[in-house]
Amino acid sequence: MAVPKKRTSKSKKKSRRSHWINKAKTRIRNFLNLAKSISNKKATSFAYSTIKN
């Protein structure tokens, strides 16, 4: 027999959403820092070609 599921509380919903948003913010921050270091050619994990055509 099918039983309806319990409803998720607002606090749990907010907690999950804020956790997801914080994870997204940290990934965006890391991406921007990497982009800045690449644009300034200070990144050590990338090889740059110095030959211009």
Curated annotation (Swiss-Prot):
Keywords: Chloroplast, Plastid, Ribonucleoprotein, Ribosomal protein. Residues 1-21 are annotated as: Disordered. One of its GO terms (cellular component) is large ribosomal subunit. GO terms for biological process: translation. It comes from Cyanidium caldarium. SUPFAM superfamilies: Zn-binding ribosomal proteins. InterPro entries: Ribosomal_bL32, Ribosomal_zn-bd. This is Large ribosomal subunit protein bL32c. Belongs to the bacterial ribosomal protein bL32 family. It is found in: Plastid, Chloroplast. GO terms for molecular function: structural constituent of ribosome.
